[in-house]
């Protein structure tokens, strides 16, 4: 173990840890844009700079390894000034339409500007003028808002493996895009939307959530994806009894925040107008609405009316364990083992 | 799965056979690609050039329905080249000699004749797999949905045991379960021969334990499987069918047969969230709550039990399945009084040794637990068979190659195989009603090769009629290099082009799984 001091507090960490990790262990906050513990380090955004005693320049804490006896300051005047200049530069060509931006309230650029009191840019930069990319049904790409942190690109290459997007060009003309500036539909993109979850600003917006609520109005419920047997953790964001957004759950031990298109964008069947909302009974050849009592009485009568061996049931690989358990308990209690589900199918 | 999903990225070699993982289990697919980037050898075996094949060190494109021959060929090479794990075979297994004798004739040359895979590639695959520090096999329906599915699974086990690749981190045999809770449905005894935790219903101990707890006597004789239930209806033996959240009218092989049964059964109850093709045939339809509208647990493919939490209320008068079942039980005088899913789970844990140590409280605190978890202190089991197999020794079973039940002939010259795609799921009940996915992939496109397209004078987007001995469908075609000449691929997501009108309901004699993966068809241009 290596021992160092951050803002006057002592901390011990593994020798291969970075200053950022040591600070995290102490609960000391350091802002970042381009850092993610699951991705390769690039040290590009310079938001995480800190002062280390005995070193002349500020260092990027995300990719500077700790040394024994190191003395670190994360909140000095110098550090703040550097971060402010950074934000200032980013704001120089960032649209300030926070009023209608879906990311408002959950945007790291907004949060850090608030924290360091940066309200507008002192630099007069050229504005970017990219057309909105909204041809796919899953999410909108507004590259005018992109701060080029590269999280989406690394997520696509290192987590998904699709490798659909790159940072094209250099300098002011840098832009995240699929090859040949093609729309994502014509690229290897599989619309997992993990880039959307990774983006710290409002450059990538899921279409299903637009206008459905501010992040701070939403309640989060952690649950499990209803599709395949991988069992990825999902975070459902709820407002007024409606799921308005879905993200991968980073705390889930199976999926660690990863998802595919079905889990991410495929659960709004919940609010389909075709959902069944009342029991139906066949009368004169037609299915007609009925009360629960009438339907359940009829089913109970029919279940009672046959010998156990004349009864069979298909249980569900979609339903919960508890429901499958009760289904087989019910049928077995009625004297039949004729129970199966589509495991074989 | 004998391993955990989290172990995939550290494997030395991955053998993926009959699984289009990046489309059917995408997040597991990400992990396989991660493993490959970290240096694992990736071997993909499939009749189609699936997406994962593009990332593979070695892609073996075998003829559909020839898995056992290929697996036997790999074992043959491993034994012949001295790559077998002799210590593992000696200490942990039995029946090696018989199995070794059976694979003797499966030389790479002979296997090439059957499978169409070059003998050299078979040798290379065997070496990559057997020489890795830890090697894991993954398969899905491409292995099981055959009339010889049970043999395929046994051959996979033989391969893993001969190379000592079981019972270790990142090494094992991993069937990837299709639906979110298919593992749980099996664990819960939604099967004709076992109650929870695979306790045989006809065993005396099971009988007395459940009788004491439930207060009713369990029927002793094992019941009918899904395919037998359909036949039972047609024979007149089964009069009432209760379907909870399944859609056999689209998912079952030889659909016409199933539709006939659903029409014939005296009373059909269907409990579901949509008016599915099956529900439309019902006498009573009960509206159910969907996953985000109730509490409970799912068990994933790595045996991990996880909490499912309610986020919103069910629409209208729809109710959770467990509520409906309890209502029925009380009308039938069974006197259930569960206060909620947690109480049901406590009963499951009480009656099921592999779930005994699991509770909602632990799931909440520990983020899921993998069975077997026999007591409250047990941390769960990330990989199975660590020190010994469930039954003591691992048993080798000799397996012979058996051709598919139906092969292409002069009248039906093409081979049809079925599966899923990335965007849709199963019978499409949920994904087709998603506002984004539905319109993005609105229709089925049957895949055929360039060669066959040219021969038949068909172009991309043309409407064709595909027929088998059992039925016909009209569908548009996609001309692609994914399928080899002679093979047609369709998914079963779309009722407008219900591929199961064509498939063969010939089942594996043991597992009773129909042969979805191979049947003979012909294809001709259709008038719209
Ligand atoms: S949606 Fe997924 S595949 Fe597509 S660009 Fe984003 S991360 Fe890559
Ligand atoms: S789109 Fe978002 S995640 Fe991607 S580089 Fe731009 S700001 Fe970063
Ligand atoms: S998010 Fe995708 S991979 Fe994960 S469980 Fe759902 S369907 Fe499967």
Describe each model-derived feature in a short phrase.
Chain A
Residues 34, 62, 72, 165, ...:
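Short clusters of hydrophobic/aromatic residues that line enzyme substrate/ligand-binding pockets
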Residues 8-68, 77-82:
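N-terminal cofactor/phosphate-binding cores enriched in small/glycine residues
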Residues 10, 164, 233-235:
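Short, surface-exposed charged micro-motifs
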Residues 1-9:
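Eukaryote-biased recognition of intrinsically disordered, low-complexity regulatory segments
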Residues 46-191, 196-223, 242:
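Fe-S ferredoxin-like electron-transfer domains
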Residues 95, 212-345:
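Catalytic alpha/large subunits of respiratory electron-transfer oxidoreductases
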Residues 35-38, 142-145, 180-185, 311-320:
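Conserved short loop/turn motifs at secondary-structure junctions
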Residues 5, 51, 237-238:
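A general beta-strand register signal
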């Amino acid at each position: 173990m290596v021992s160092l001091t951050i803002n006057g507090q002592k901390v011990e960490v593994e020798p291969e840890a970075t200053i950022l990790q040591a600070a995290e262990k102490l609960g000391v906050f350091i802002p970042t844009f381009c850092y993610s513990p699951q991705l390769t380090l690039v040290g590009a955004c310079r938001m995480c700079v800190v002062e280390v005693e005995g070193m002349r320049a500020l260092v990027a804490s995300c990719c500077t390894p700790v040394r024994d006896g190191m003395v670190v300051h994360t909140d000095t005047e110098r550090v703040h000034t550097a971060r402010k200049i950074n934000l200032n530069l980013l704001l120089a060509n960032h649209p300030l339409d926070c009023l209608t931006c879906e990311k408002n309230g959950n945007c790291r650029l907004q949060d850090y500007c608030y924290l360091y009191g940066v309200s507008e840019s002192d630099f007069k930069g050229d504005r970017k003028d990219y057309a909105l990319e909204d041809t796919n049904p899953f999410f909108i790409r507004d590259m005018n808002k992109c701060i080029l942190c590269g999280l989406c690109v690394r997520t696509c290459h290192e987590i998904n493996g699709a490798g659909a997007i790159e940072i094209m060009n250099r300098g002011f003309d840098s832009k995240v895009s699929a090859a040949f500036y093609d729309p994502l539909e014509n690229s290897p993109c599989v619309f997992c939307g993990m880039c959307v979850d990774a983006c710290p600003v409002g450059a990538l917006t899921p279409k299903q959530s637009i206008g459905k609520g501010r992040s701070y109005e939403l309640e989060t419920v952690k649950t499990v994806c209803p599709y395949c047997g991988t069992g990825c953790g999902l975070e459902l964001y709820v407002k007024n009894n409606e799921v308005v957004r879905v993200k991968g759950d980073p705390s889930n031990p199976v999926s660690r925040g990863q998802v595919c298109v079905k889990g991410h964008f495929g659960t709004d069947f919940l609010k389909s107008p075709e959902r069944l909302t009342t029991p139906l009974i066949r009368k004169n050849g037609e299915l007609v609405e009925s009360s629960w009592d009438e339907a359940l009485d009829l089913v109970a009568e029919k279940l009672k009316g046959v010998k156990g061996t004349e009864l069979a049931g298909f249980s569900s690989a979609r339903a919960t364990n508890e429901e499958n358990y009760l289904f087989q308990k019910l049928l077995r209690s009625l004297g039949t083992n004729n129970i199966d589900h589509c495991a074989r199918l | 799965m004998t391993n955990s999903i989290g172990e995939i990225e550290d494997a030395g070699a991955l053998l993926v056979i009959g699984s289009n993982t990046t489309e059917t289990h995408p997040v597991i697919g990400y992990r396989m690609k991660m493993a490959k980037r970290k240096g694992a050898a990736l071997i993909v075996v499939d009749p189609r050039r699936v997406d994962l094949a593009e990332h593979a060190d070695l892609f073996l494109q075998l003829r559909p329905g020839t898995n056992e021959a290929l697996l036997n060929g790999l074992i043959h090479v491993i034994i012949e080249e001295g790559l077998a794990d002799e210590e593992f075979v000696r200490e942990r297994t039995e029946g090696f000699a018989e199995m070794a004798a059976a694979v003797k004739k499966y030389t790479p040359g002979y296997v090439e004749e059957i499978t169409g895979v070059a003998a050299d590639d078979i040798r290379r695959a065997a070496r990559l797999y057997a020489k890795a520090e830890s090697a894991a096999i993954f398969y899905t329906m491409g292995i099981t949905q055959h009339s010889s599915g049970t043999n395929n699974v046994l051959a996979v086990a033989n391969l893993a045991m001969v190379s000592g690749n079981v019972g270790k981190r990142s090494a094992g045999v991993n069937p990837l379960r299709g639906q979110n809770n298919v593992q749980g449905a099996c664990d819960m005894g939604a099967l004709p021969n076992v109650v929870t935790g695979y306790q045989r219903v006809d065993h005396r101990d099971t009988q007395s334990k459940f009788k004491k707890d439930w207060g009713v006597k369990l029927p002793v004789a094992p019941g009918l499987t899904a395919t037998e239930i359909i036949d039972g209806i047609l024979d007149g033996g089964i009069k009432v069918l209760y379907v909870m959240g399944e859609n056999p009218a689209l998912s079952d092989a030889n659909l016409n047969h199933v539709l006939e049964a659903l029409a014939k059964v005296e009373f059909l109850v269907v409990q579901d969230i949509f008016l599915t093709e099956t529900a439309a045939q019902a006498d009573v339809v009960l509206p159910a709550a969907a996953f985000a509208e109730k509490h409970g647990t799912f068990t994933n493919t790595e045996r991990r039990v996880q909490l499912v939490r309610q986020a919103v209320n069910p629409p209208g008068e729809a109710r959770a399945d467990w509520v409906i079942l309890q209502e029925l039980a009380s009308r039938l005088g069974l006197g259930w009084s569960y206060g909620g899913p947690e109480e049901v789970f406590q009963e499951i844990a009480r009656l099921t040794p592999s779930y005994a140590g699991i509770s909602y409280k632990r799931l909440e605190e520990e983020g899921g637990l993998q069975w077997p978890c026999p007591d409250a202190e047990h941390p769960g089991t990330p990989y199975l068979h660590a020190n010994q197999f469930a039954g003591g020794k691992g048993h080798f079973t000799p397996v012979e190659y058996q051709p598919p039940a139906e092969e292409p002939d002069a009248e039906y010259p093409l081979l049809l195989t079925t599966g899923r795609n990335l965007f849709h799921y199963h019978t499409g009940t949920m994904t087709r009603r998603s506002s984004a996915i539905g319109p993005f992939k609105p229709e089925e496109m049957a895949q055929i090769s360039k060669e066959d397209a040219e021969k038949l004078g068909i172009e991309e987007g043309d409407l064709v009629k595909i027929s088998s001995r059992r039925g016909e469908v009209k569908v548009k075609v996609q001309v692609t290099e994914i399928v080899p000449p002679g093979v047609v691929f369709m998914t079963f997501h779309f009722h407008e082009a219900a591929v199961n009108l064509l498939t063969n309901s010939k089942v594996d004699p043991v597992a009773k799984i129909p042969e979805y993966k191979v049947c003979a068809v012909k294809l001709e241009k259709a008038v719209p």
